[in-house]
Amino acid sequence: MLPDALRTELAAVPDLRLLTQPDDLERFSRDAYDYSPVLQQRLAQCRAELVVRPETVDAVVRVAAACRQHGVPLTLRGSGTGNYGQSVPLESGVVMLMSQLRAVRSIDQSSGVVTVECGCLMKDLNRELARVGRQLRLMPSTWRSATIGGFIAGGSGGIGSVRWGFLRDPGHLLGLEVVTMEQQPRVLQLEAGDAEALNHAYGTNGIITALRLATATSVDWQELVVDCPDWRTAVDLARRCTSAAIDLHLCTVLEAAVVELLPNWDLPQRRSDRLLLLVAPDAVSTVQRLASAVGAEMTHLGAEADRHGSGLRELSWNHTTLHLRQRDPGWTYLQMLLPQPEINCLETLKQTWGDDLLWHLEGVRQQGVQRLASLPLVRWRGAEALEQLMQHCRDLGALIFNPHVLTVEGGGLGVVDGDQVATKHRYDPAGLLNPGKLGGFSN
């Protein structure tokens, strides 16, 4: 039970709104964890006892101090677009909505480095960057509704990963403003080295209030659809495109059965294995040549900027899963890095699992090397069948990033990050920030 003294104390904080209606408590205690039947069962009853929405960093400090004083768990929430229960309060307590901290504080005109508050929507941030000829390097497919702080705290990569790798790669996150959960909370300005431990930590070891990020030069991305005569050709062409000397922002590979189930949005109506590409204008002719050489048919849809919300990026990454689940909630998914050569693993798994496994691949840059990751659609047949499938993938050399578990470690490489745990001990010694999500601390 939330102490009355805490409610009274928070009610007196300027620039802080308290939400207490049952509908608000339910709504803001959820994210998109229903992608996973496992998490859906585990998290369905989790509820905050109070939701607060600060408008200033000072209000954040006051909330942190009050929760620490009363020993009440505090869970942070951006837009709630995460898929792993990152912002779900496992131990109830207070959920703090960060969406009102949304100012773009500065953009360096020469370097493009941006300092932005955590609650800024990525679409709004990208719009501000475009005014000075810059753009975000990495985005989730939920970029229109996701906050930049939520992406750093709970995401890992997405659109742009084929060129820029993943968020934890050195060079993306250049600094953080962080409020600690100490007895006397502090506002810290962390440089890149110290900030790294809070990157993809689910808000368990510090409260991110602002970020400093590197950006990229704006490109007028062109949308290309390439229909291939067979699956082997599609996978091979994806490898050729990702290794070509072209500016490539997205390389999605979909087997024909997935293409049939996605919104068509005036795309070519063919039942074929398909590539979805975002490329620079000077790369269109190169992709055309590569496609023609293997008997594939390329369609140039034009500039992405002209698509007005129904572009190819909304068919990629987790939006592929979203669209299929809207048609049939019996689909769930996995995340994995495929072994090389990829086709052997892909075909072996397909032979065993048949139509219960539909292939969706994404080109990524992993530790400086072009690789193919996969977010396959998986027909839900129960937890035991899912575990058997994951073990089969591991046996073939795939690296699984399990989207059906709650902890930072479980969804990653399965090992404890000592720096993340040490940072939690330093900034949240009582373990009140998003408890239960950082396994190394819990254990």
Where are these regions (language model features)?
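A conserved active-site cap/scaffold subdomain adjacent to cofactor or substrate pockets
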Residues: 245-248, 257-300
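N-terminal flexible segment immediately upstream of the FAD-binding catalytic core
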Residues: 1-65, 81-112, 258-266, 305-328, ...
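General beta-strand structural signal in soluble alpha/beta enzymes
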Residues: 18-22, 53-54, 74-78, 96-98, ...
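Helix N-cap motif at beta-to-alpha junctions
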Residues: 230-232, 278-285, 339-342, 378-383
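FAD-binding subdomain of flavoenzyme oxidoreductases
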Residues: 103-107, 122-123, 127-247, 251-252
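Conserved glycine-rich FAD pyrophosphate-binding loop
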Residues: 77-79, 86-93, 99, 143, ...
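Short amphipathic alpha-helices in soluble, non-transmembrane regions
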Residues: 9, 67, 237-242, 283-296, ...
